[in-house]
Swiss-Prot record:
Belongs to the ATPase B chain family. CDD domains: ATP-synt_Fo_b (cd06503). This is ATP synthase subunit b. The gene is atpF. Pfam families: ATP-synt_B (PF00430).
Length: 171
């Protein structure tokens, strides 16, 4: 490191001797202007050819993000509208299903009532027919028994008394 410092010091002394012997650090020398000119050229090149494409890409990205955000808002609105439409349609369908179910219950009750009335009528008719048959059979049995009572009573009296009782002769 000592060699490097001595080399720098030697070059500074040579530069001072060439410049006339006096160097003031407040007064700029020619290298400052050369460095300033190179810096301004590099700055101009960067400003002209590097910054515009980067700015363009950033602007495109920002526009794409804004479009995506707008699309997201629009999609959210469409989803909300579709959800509201779905809920409305579902409520209407439930109401319609309820009314159909109520109508079916009423129709079912009417059918049951009609069938019950028909069955009750058939039962009443069957009971009436059976009652009439039983009445006829009872009347027939009664008249048959009444016609045979005289003969049976005479036979029974003959057996009990041991005498032949003829009901025709006593009349």
């Amino acid at each position: 490191m000592g060699d490097l410092t001595s080399t720098n010091l030697a070059s500074a002394i040579l530069a001072a001797e060439e410049g006339g012997g006096t160097s003031n650090f407040l007064l700029p020398n020619g290298t400052f202007f050369a460095v300033l000119l190179i810096f301004l050229i590099v700055l101009g090149v960067i400003a002209k050819w590097v910054v515009p494409p980067i700015s363009k890409v950033l602007a495109e990205r920002e526009a794409m993000l804004a479009k995506t955000a707008a699309d997201n808002r629009k999609s959210a609105e469409q989803v909300a509208a579709a959800r509201a439409d779905y809920d409305k349609t579902l409520a209407e369908a439930r109401g319609e299903a309820s009314s159909i179910r109520d109508e079916a219950r009423v129709a079912g009750r009417q059918v049951v009532d009609e069938k019950r009335a028909t069955a009750n009528g058939e039962v009443a008719e069957t009971v009436k027919t059976a009652d009439e048959k039983l009445t006829q059979q009872g009347s027939a049995a009664q008249s048959e028994l009444q016609s045979s009572v005289d003969a049976l009573s005479a036979t029974l009296a003959s057996r009990i008394l041991g005498v032949d009782v003829n009901t025709r002769g006593s009349q």
